[in-house]
Amino acid sequence: MRFVNTCAQKQAFGLVLLSPFTIFAPDFRGKFMKNKLLYTFLFTLLVVAGLFAMHFLPSVSFRGEPLRRVDLLSDIRIKKEIAEPMDSDTLVLPPPVKPAFVDTCKSGMVCIEEYADSAGRGMEYFYEALGKVSSLDRPVRIAYFGDSFIEADILTGDLREMLQKRFGGCGVGYVPITTKIAGFRPTVHHSFGGWSSHSITDSTYFDRFRQDISNHYFIPSSGAYVSLKGEKRFLSHIDTCEVSTCYFLTSDSLRLAASVNGGEAQPFSVGGKEELQSVSVNGRIGSVRWKVEQLDSTALFYAVTMDPRQGVVVDNFSTRGSSGQQLGNIPMSILRQYNRLRTYDLIVLQYGLNVASDEVMNYTYYKDAMKPIVERLKTAFPEASVLIVGVGDRENKDENGELRTMPGVKRLIRYQQALAAETGVAFWNMFEAMGGEGSMVEMVNHKPQMANYDYTHINFRGGKHIAGLLFETLMYGKEQYEKRKAYEME
């Protein structure tokens, strides 16, 4: 009985202990849940308010790139046109320059603008040479200078093919003795050995008084060689050529040998001179190997070529990271000697990728630096037309993380146009020909892709596209020149 009472007491005690919790538990959980919802709401409100506040913080950059601005309403916000920033040094942007003579231009085509001076230094010389291509005792030559935009024969390879299909010709033209991109260039097989190579882009000492037209020089050891072989898989007209020339400078005698298509070596004994020299082999040349058999002193070698006897040839002179100002360091004597041995009919200057920026809007300094360089080229090559090609589209991300044309690009183009006008040469607006603002994004998104994801450089497909645009405007310019000339003779 006692045991029963004890159990009953414990049971009753348990009821007493449990009863308050049982009675008040629903009220406790309700208050707890209400507080939890309130705290969650307040925390969310605080986070959203913080994100809205962060939108009004100043722009922040990391390693030169603007970090994306926080904007919760970016998907529904009506976008406004943002005016290009002006820097404090900008005075007056050069006005658009009207060409001296305005030909009609096809709808949809961006034509070459002529700013010929009193000596007629526009495109006249080049168009005249093309008109006499079959009667000249040499090929019509184009020197195409540029930066990494044309590296490895991008653009120039396709332009060369188009011109050679229309006017004849073969071969890739001028090839420096050695190169760091031999495996990347698909228009020629290039091998070499036994050379001490020097380039304007070297971080160590470079003697600018010894350089050639491509901003290189090469010092051979005995037995040094360079081989070129035509390529038929990538483009036409470059699998064989008719003339291969070796360019060098030596004050003492030396002996060279050239082997064509793996055949017997043809020897050359060369005397010393204080000027540029060249020796050539002829024939149907699919491959050629030049070798230094003996040298009595330190000679400088520059390039070997694969050229036609007639027709057109395009020499690619690309320098990575260049703004074009390195051309001003080439000795005038060397330029004049190249004009004597390798006469050019058109000199193209395509730079700007390494000049345009977000921060700079006034490019007077660049225009003024390039003016004497253009004048030097006109003096050294008095019978060559000069064409300045404006910088192409270049995209980067703004503070909202959206791709846009770099603000400095369009400004720089205006200064490049002014450079052409002030030096009396021709100008082609590649930016507009590509499609203007956003065209680089379209080339990247194109199927197949025509540009790289840096939104700065084109690939070989993009090069073919732009080469086609330039080729068509060159042909149209030639047609208009011939019509104008015929009209003036009536």
Residue ranges and their predicted role:
Residues R141, E151-S253, G271-D368, H457-I458:
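Conserved SGNH/GDSL esterase-like catalytic core that processes O-acyl groups on lipids
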Residues I78-Y144, D212-S214, F218-S222:
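Membrane/wall-proximal cationic-aromatic binding patches
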Residues G64-L67, V348-N354, R376-I413, N429:
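Active-site segments of SGNH/GDSL-like serine hydrolases
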